[in-house]
Amino acid sequence: MPSEKTFTIGDVSQQTGVASVTLRAWERRYGLIKPQRTAKGHRVYNQGNIQDIQHILSWLNRGVAISKVATLLASGKSSAAAAPVAEQWLVEQNKLLAGITELKQTSLNQQLDRLNKSVPFITLCEYVYHPLQATLAQRWQQQPLGYQLEQQLWQQSWQRQTLIMALRTEKQKLQGHCYLASLDLKGPSLGYYLLHSLLLQSGLRVTAFSKVEDLAGLTRLHNNAEWPLIVYAEQRIEQTAFKPLANLSTMWKDGILCCGLASDIHHEQLTSLGIDFVDGHSNDAWQSAVMKTWLEQTKR
């Protein structure tokens, strides 16, 4: 009788899109998954575990708090028949908003640590981080007293999160390398940090440049041009930048990929130059066919 097929935690992470750190949290903290262990203590998952993970994801995508998922799984209820619980995501947004507006960096970091460990990152992007950023943008347009401090606090918290994820990725099996360069001269946006985080959680080693003022300078990377390059921009790109962009695309082995809301603005110019692009927010771009193809090519 053939033995049951098993998977490593890295295999499961790649198959389900759930980061290894999140899978461990679901096991240790919430008791949601019960993988077997090898003689050396390594986790091994079977197909039943993967089905459990899919069920957990379906509940989370309905807005159910991770702490309540175990009870729902035990009840045998189907998430398909459940109404979305948008209030839970609003609660998480408000907790983060309080940490920002009250300038409580420790509290803010703790909230982000908890969320990023216990909930799949792509789900957080769609239901927590992007909606919160829209709220913050409206607030900062009114320029309340000390709003620049809030902006710096929010940015520093994401610098910390990407560093944590980068260090974690260094310990995992290498999936591939890429470059990420932001053209936003006002500094890296939340969308940049979210895309950086998604790349790291996919297992890629990312060499990131958070503020590139001179695109021609990226030609210095040509010795490693086999590593794919993503150019990110939220704001309108200066017309003088398109010639250097075209030169970079020609220099790179498989061309370059442009991401960010600027791709919505300049899609006609990018198309005419033959430059691949993905528009929309980070979570939408990440789930696009173009990005999935790019990931497959990067990891081959």
Positions of predicted regions on the chain:
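A short, structure-level motif marking secondary-structure boundaries and short turns
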Residues: 7-9, 39-41, 81, 179-182, ...
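Polyanion-binding surface elements
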Residues: 2-22
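A short alpha-helix capping/helix-coil boundary motif
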Residues: 1-3, 33-36, 173-176, 225
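Long amphipathic alpha-helical segments
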Residues: 15, 20-24, 31-168
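Surface-exposed charge patches
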Residues: 11, 25, 197
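A generic secondary-structure micro-motif detector
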Residues: 12-13, 43-46, 184-185, 208
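C-terminal regulatory/effector modules of DNA-binding transcriptional regulators
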Residues: 159-300
